[in-house]
C-alpha cells in the first residue's frame, strides 16, 4: 500500500514555510504544503496552536471559497493583534461575497453596512475597538504614493502593496479602481468648468430708460448657469480624498 512521505518538520519550520508562502502570495503552493503536513494527533495538536499555520489555513480556505472553514478557524482561535487587519479583511470580504451571491448583484455601501452589522467581527480577531472602515493615514499615504507611480498595478504589485498595508489584494485593486474613477470624474468636471469660464464676460446692454446695466451672454443663460454650478459642485465632491472601505 502506497504511503505518503512523512515530513520531519518542526512546528517552527512549518510556520516559517507558511509565512514565506503567504508573503509570496502563492496561495496554491501554500495549500499544497498544508495538505502535505502530517496528520498524527501529536503533530496536529502542535500545529493547531501555531498562529502562522492557522492564518495560512484561513487564507487558503478564503481563496478556495470554503467560507465555513474560514469562519470556523477565525471564531475558534485567538489571534494576536498583528494578524487582526488581514483576518478582519478576510472575514468581511467572505461575508460580502456570500451576500452578493445570494442577492445576485454587487453590494452597495448600505448593503455592506448591513452585512457588517449582521456579521460583526469575532473577538478572536478584534480587540473591541470600533473600526471606522476607513483606511489609516499611513495606508492612504502608501496607496497614493504607489498610485502616482502606476495607476494600473499588475497582480504582483497588488500583492506586494497588500502585504505592505495589511489589506487584501482585492481591497487594493478596489482602491485603485475607485481612485481612477474619481480622478476621471474630477478631470471631466474641470474641463466643463473651464469651458463655461472660457466663454468670457457677457455683453453689457443698457435697457431703455433705465440706468442699471443688464448683463447678457453665456453666463446669464439659465442652462449655462446651472451647468456652471453643477460643475463646481461636482468638483468639490469628486476631489475629496475619501478612501473608506465600504
From Swiss-Prot:
Listed Low complexity bias regions: 219-246
Keywords carried by this UniProt record: Developmental protein, DNA-binding, Homeobox, Nucleus, Phosphoprotein
Region span, Disordered: 190-246
Subcellular location: Nucleus
Tissue expr: In the developing embryo, expressed mainly in the ventral optic stalk, optic chiasma, the neural retina and the primordial tissues that give rise to the pituitary/hypothalamus axis. Not expressed in the lens placode.
Residues within the DNA-binding region(s): 126-186
Phosphoserine PTM positions: 221, 225, 227-228
Pfam families listed in its UniProt record: Homeodomain (PF00046), SIX1_SD (PF16878)
Predominant localisation class: nucleus
GO (cellular component) term, any one: nucleus
Sequence positions bearing Phosphothreonine: 212
Gene Ontology molecular function terms on file: RNA polymerase II cis-regulatory region sequence-specific DNA binding
Domain of life: Eukaryota
Subunit structure of this chain's protein: Interacts with TLE4 and TLE5.
Function recorded in the entry: May be involved in eye development.
PANTHER family with a match to the protein in the record: HOMEOBOX PROTEIN SIX (PTHR10390), HOMEOBOX PROTEIN SIX6 (PTHR10390:SF12)
Family note: Belongs to the SIX/Sine oculis homeobox family.
Protein name: Homeobox protein SIX6
Amino acid at each position: 500500500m502506497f504511503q505518503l512521505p512523512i515530513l520531519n518538520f518542526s512546528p517552527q519550520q512549518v510556520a516559517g514555510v507558511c509565512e514565506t508562502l503567504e508573503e509570496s502570495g502563492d496561495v496554491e503552493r501554500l495549500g499544497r504544503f498544508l495538505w502535505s503536513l502530517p496528520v498524527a494527533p501529536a503533530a496536529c495538536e502542535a500545529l493547531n496552536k501555531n498562529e502562522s499555520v492557522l492564518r495560512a489555513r484561513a487564507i487558503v480556505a478564503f481563496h478556495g471559497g470554503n467560507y465555513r472553514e474560514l469562519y470556523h478557524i477565525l471564531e475558534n482561535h485567538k489571534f494576536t493583534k498583528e494578524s487582526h487587519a488581514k483576518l478582519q479583511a478576510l472575514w468581511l470580504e467572505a461575508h460580502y461575497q456570500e451576500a452578493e451571491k445570494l442577492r445576485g448583484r454587487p453590494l452597495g455601501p448600505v448593503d455592506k453596512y448591513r452585512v457588517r452589522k449582521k456579521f460583526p467581527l469575532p473577538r478572536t480577531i478584534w480587540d473591541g475597538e470600533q473600526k471606522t472602515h476607513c483606511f489609516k493615514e499611513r495606508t492612504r499615504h502608501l496607496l497614493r504614493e504607489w498610485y502616482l507611480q502606476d495607476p494600473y498595478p499588475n497582480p504582483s504589485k497588488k500583492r506586494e502593496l497588500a502585504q505592505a498595508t495589511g489589506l487584501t489584494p482585492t481591497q487594493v485593486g478596489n482602491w485603485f479602481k475607485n481612485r481612477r474613477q474619481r480622478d476621471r470624474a474630477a478631470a471631466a468636471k474641470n474641463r466643463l468648468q473651464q469651458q463655461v469660464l472660457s466663454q468670457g464676460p457677457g455683453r453689457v446692454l443698457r435697457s431703455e430708460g433705465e440706468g442699471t446695466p443688464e448683463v447678457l451672454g453665456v453666463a446669464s443663460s439659465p442652462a449655462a448657469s446651472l451647468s456652471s454650478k453643477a460643475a463646481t459642485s461636482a468638483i468639490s465632491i469628486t476631489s475629496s480624498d475619501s478612501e473608506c472601505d465600504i
